[in-house]
A protein has these predicted regions:
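Immediate flanking context of iron-sulfur cluster ligation sites
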Residues: 17-34, 54, 87
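C-terminal TM-helix exit segments that contain a strictly Trp-centered aromatic cap at the helix terminus
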Residues: 23-28, 75-90, 107
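Membrane-embedded alpha-helical transmembrane segments of multi-pass integral membrane proteins
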Residues: 16-23, 49-52, 72-82, 140-147
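Extracytosolic (periplasmic/ER-lumenal) interhelical loops and adjacent juxtamembrane/interface segments
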Residues: 88-134
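Membrane-interface loop-to-helix entry segments
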Residues: 38-48, 111, 129-143
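Non-cytosolic membrane-interface motifs at loop->transmembrane helix junctions
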Residues: 33-43, 95-98
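Interfacial segments of alpha-helical transmembrane regions
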Residues: 4-15, 55-77, 146, 150
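Membrane-interface capping segments at transmembrane-helix boundaries
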Residues: 150-157
Length: 157
């Protein structure tokens, strides 16, 4: 695979990552849906992919960056797969994902705590085309991982 095609792929990854983060932030801040903790964690690989794509666009060593990008999206597949499993009731959360943070005894503290409750990771509050954002993230990350493995295998050093 030529360097020019790899460069185009990094542009696609940059665009996909930018769009994915933009949608997540739009859903949160414009539409008003508060994300669960796993939804927030799932943004991290896309932020890393943005940075890697920018570096790759200006750096000559694309193969190493492809490897890092592949590992990043593999982590995204695992994280989003875990989240989808929780949403579907297949997997029980390992850590508190329920938003049960009301340990306050005073009225003011209880009211303040109610405003800061994280949504339960099992609940799908927002979906696109009937598919949860965690499921869409899993699909996007899985496809990108497969493409990255293919490109890595056939890329020039």
């Amino acid at each position: 695979m030529s360097d020019q095609n790899i460069k185009k792929f990094f542009i696609i990854v940059f665009t996909t990552s930018f769009f994915s983060l933009a949608v997540a932030l739009y859903v949160e801040y414009v539409l008003g849906f508060k994300p669960c903790i796993l939804c927030i964690y799932q943004r991290i690989p896309y932020a890393i992919a943005l940075l890697i794509s920018l570096i790759a666009f200006f750096n000559g060593n694309k193969k190493k960056l492809l490897l890092i990008l592949g590992l990043t999206f593999m982590a995204s597949v695992l994280l989003s797969g875990y989240h989808v499993g929780i949403e579907k009731g297949i997997i029980e959360p390992i850590f508190s994902c329920t938003g049960d943070n009301i340990n306050a005894l005073e009225k003011e503290e209880i009211l303040k705590s109610l405003n800061n409750i994280q949504p339960d990771c099992r609940d799908v509050d927002f979906s696109l085309f009937g598919i949860s954002l965690a499921t869409l993230n899993f699909i996007i990350s899985f496809v990108l991982t497969i493409v990255i493995v293919y490109i890595f295998k056939y890329a020039k050093k």
